[in-house]
Amino acid sequence: MNTQNNSTHIEIPENWGMYMQRIDGKPSVTRVNLALYDSAPYSGYQYRIQLAVYYKNQTESGLPTAEENPQLWEIEDAFVELLKQVDAIDAGLMKWNNRLNFFFYVKKPEGMEAKFIDNLKQQFPDYEYKLWVDEDKAWECYFETLYPDKYGMQEIKNNQVLNALLKHNDNLEKERQIDHYLFFKDEETAHFFLETVEKEGFKETAHRTDEGEELPVMTCISRVDIADDIHDITWHLLDIAESFGGDYDGWESPIATD
């Protein structure tokens, strides 16, 4: 992380990811601009704005109903258009605790409530809105609340593969061989890892060593699984790999259709 100097009009990198997390025991669907991580906090953008839009209907978990989601997507689109009209950096959003929360950073918070709430009320008068302003020079909300931990980051990567499969009409509930790639510092730790996962039905299908790399030993392990279960599977392998000083690098799957 480093501090970056910016003019009024700055070009912001974008790489959006979505994942589930729990905050205060409640589930949150979190969408975050991952690309901000390396340059944040942005110099001068020290005020964090949180804009809440309260659902009209929600599930017991505090998430919106499937029926209300399309209306919330329209509100999201309207918010993005309003954000283009001010000097602000969009950090992300959370659907959590019966409300949709937008988070963005500005240099000057004056006039933001009128800009966003008044305009959104005109377009979507049936909703209740609230806006908070907090000084957050270090962008703690971005780093500690919006940005994913290692499990959330793996979920984002998983979703990218799952979405690619769905584009080819994959049936995610159908069993298929799934290949996982992992890296270790030496043959010994790779061997101990393999001994552990083989007890869970995995088998090694490829192995190579690339001298000069920090983790030179690559192993590919495979097992027949359901793609819909991939989050739990990858989180488990990630933990085991890290316990041996290794790195879980990802997975691939053939397309499985009915």
State where each predicted segment sits.
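Long, contiguous binding/interaction regions
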Residues: M1-D258
